[in-house]
A protein has these predicted regions:
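Bacterial N-terminal signal peptides
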Residues: 5-18
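Generic hydrophobic-segment detector
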Residues: 5-8, 151, 224, 303-304
Length: 326
């Protein structure tokens, strides 16, 4: 029996999707059915299980609303968990908005969770800590709203980012390259910038003026010319991360430009090539060559736009309900 990662492209939502794996090239077709037929769910971003044993989930919408989906949808109605103002987050209705939500590993004892979203005036992305004061009712503490990170965003696209906790208890955050096309400011390879990276921080501690601490084993902590938060460089628009906790493997779906969509295995200190490369091939529109000290990590899987569109994310499936996924 093989355990296979499942990755889904945007076109998957039309009627059915192919399961593309790094372990093999075969495609398994399964059907998709509507789960929330009577609920307005514009631009769903993610589905997050509430880690309290209740069976409830949160449906995160890019426009700023988070819905509570009960375990028994026949007996209980969907309700609102929180709602952010779209006017404060979004100027151009494309990639801006509420992009990620993750619960703290010790949520049952501290009630904490984290949002990643854009803000305007000035244009920026923020990682914010919030708290649930009544876990049974999923009621928010209105007085707990702590901003940990603010990242200036030059444009309205490539704002991608999703926070995920690793098995080490640290928070990993993917960030886009700042937008437009061709990475015009070379942020992805700029080690002073937090754009075009995967970051790793300790949200349970503070350090100096920071609202978080930088783990001692981060690859660039204390290295001149580098931000210590950086875990990897060379990302374009890493829309989703997924931790396969049993194998302690971090997967990343990095959206391409014109040539390739990438699935990457995230490694400590790795450089994934953008904008010198797109996928395993040279990115010729920049008309430049990397110097000899650059070492790039190839994606474990890539596909061209003749096969599909934007890679949107995925999971490693370890269940037994759908044996065709093995």
């Amino acid at each position: 029996m093989k355990l296979l990662p499942i990755w889904i492209g945007i076109t998957a939502y039309l009627s059915c999707f192919g399961i593309i794996t790094s372990a093999q090239t075969e495609t398994v077709t399964i059907s998709i059915q509507h789960e929330l037929k009577e609920t307005e769910t514009p631009k769903p971003i993610s589905w997050v299980v509430v880690p309290d044993g209740s069976g409830r989930s949160l449906l995160v919408l890019q426009g700023g609303q988070v819905l509570v989906v009960p375990a028994d949808r026949k007996q209980s109605k969907i309700s609102s968990f929180l709602k952010l103002s779209p006017d404060q987050m979004i100027v151009k209705d494309f990639e801006e908005g509420l992009l990620g939500l993750v619960f703290h590993p010790k949520y049952r004892s501290n009630g904490l969770f984290y949002l990643y979203h854009t803000l305007q005036s000035p244009k920026r992305s923020v990682l914010v800590e919030r708290r649930v004061k009544d876990q049974k009712k999923l009621a928010l503490d209105p007085n707990h709203n702590r901003t940990l990170i603010e990242i200036e965003q030059p444009y309205w696209n490539h704002n991608s980012g999703v926070p995920e906790f690793g098995p080490d208890g640290y928070l990993y955050l993917s960030t886009g390259d700042g937008g437009k096309a061709n990475d015009p400011h070379d942020f992805s390879q700029n080690t002073f910038s937090l754009l075009g990276k995967v970051l790793r921080i300790d949200v349970d501690q503070t350090e100096g003026a920071l609202q978080y601490a930088i783990p001692e084993d981060n690859p660039f902590k204390g290295k001149p010319g580098y931000r210590g938060e950086i875990w990897t460089t060379g990302m374009r628009n890493p829309w989703r991360l997924h931790w396969d906790l049993p194998s302690k493997t971090l997967y990343c779906a990095d959206v391409g430009q014109h040539q390739k969509e990438e699935i990457n295995l995230i490694k400590r200190g790795g450089n994934y090539g953008w904008s010198f490369r797109e996928g395993t091939g040279e990115f010729s529109l920049k008309n430049r060559k990397p110097s000899s000290e650059f070492e790039f990590i190839d994606p474990v899987f890539e596909y061209g736009h003749d096969e599909g569109t934007s890679v949107s994310g995925g999971i490693v499936y370890r269940g037994t309900k759908h044996p065709e996924l093995y």
